[in-house]
């Protein structure tokens, strides 16, 4: 069984929603856990880590476990993880200065308590075109925001000697450029759509983590409708991002 722990926020919720189902459709046993606090930044994860705060909702295989609150240490010690992922909160993702010194400390903490796990950077995506949130970040477009985040995430991965990058952001940026008018990638200004957007990110995670092909995957249990045209589109886009980042995976 492949075991993945994300120290994340709602972006990790979006990205991991379908990973377990995609794996199951491919006959691969997988456990996918997200430690969730909405909008949680690396600085807040760091403070929670120092205080051993049982502040996180526990999402397992895309579903929230009701009534369960965990600390980062609780989660790290709860299983023998194969992968642990880290990410920055989206409003801060373009500014590498906000990553430190928190990222270094969290990475060291993860390696102390989950020494066998590969440590990955989850590269998040840009906001929907036209949202005023882009102006607040002093960028004009989704692509411009993503380019800033991309540079910061590369610096982050290099700094902590990460074992790889999960290129969700790259895939969504590619999809934004190539999608047809009826293809919905965001459900609001910042989050992925419950169908196609989350599916693309899930394929990226699954393909990157397992190095297995995704073209013939039969998963279709979406939270909102995804046409067969969009399924094919998602697989093509995800595969493109996976291949582009394959040289960064150890």
Describe each PLM feature range.
Residues 5-7, 122:
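Short hydrophobic segments within beta-strands
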Residues 185, 189-192, 196-250:
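Conserved catalytic region of serine esterases and O-acyltransferases that act on ester linkages
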Residues 11, 39, 126, 172, ...:
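Residue-level detector of flexible, active-site-proximal loop/helix-junction positions
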Residues 2-3, 11-100:
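Conserved SGNH/GDSL esterase-like catalytic core that processes O-acyl groups on lipids
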Residues 69-195, 207, 216:
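Alpha-helical cap/lid subdomain in secreted, periplasmic
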């Amino acid at each position: 069984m492949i075991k993945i722990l994300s120290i994340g926020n709602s972006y990790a919720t979006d990205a991991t929603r379908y990973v377990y189902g995609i794996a199951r459709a491919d006959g691969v046993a997988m456990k996918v856990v997200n430690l969730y606090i909405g909008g949680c930044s690396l600085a807040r994860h760091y403070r929670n880590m120092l205080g051993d705060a049982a502040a996180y909702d526990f999402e397992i295989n895309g579903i929230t476990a009701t009534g369960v609150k965990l600390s980062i240490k609780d989660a790290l010690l709860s299983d023998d993880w194969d992968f642990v992922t880290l990410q920055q909160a989206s409003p801060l993702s373009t500014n590498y200065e906000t990553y430190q010194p928190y990222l270094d400390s969290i990475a060291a903490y993860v390696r102390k308590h989950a020494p066998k796990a590969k440590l990955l950077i989850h590269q998040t995506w840009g906001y929907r075109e036209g949202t005023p949130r882009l102006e607040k970040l002093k960028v004009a477009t989704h692509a411009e925001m993503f380019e800033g985040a991309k540079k910061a995430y590369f610096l982050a991965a290099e700094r902590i000697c990460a074992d790889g990058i999960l290129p969700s952001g790259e895939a969504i940026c590619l999809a934004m450029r190539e999608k047809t008018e009826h293809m919905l990638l965001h459900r609001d200004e910042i989050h992925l759509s419950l169908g196609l957007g989350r599916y693309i990110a899930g394929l990226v995670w699954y393909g990157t983590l397992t190095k297995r092909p995704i073209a013939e995957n039969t998963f279709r249990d979406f939270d909102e409708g995804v046409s067969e045209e969009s399924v094919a589109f998602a697989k093509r886009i995800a595969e493109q991002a996976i291949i582009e980042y394959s040289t960064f995976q150890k």
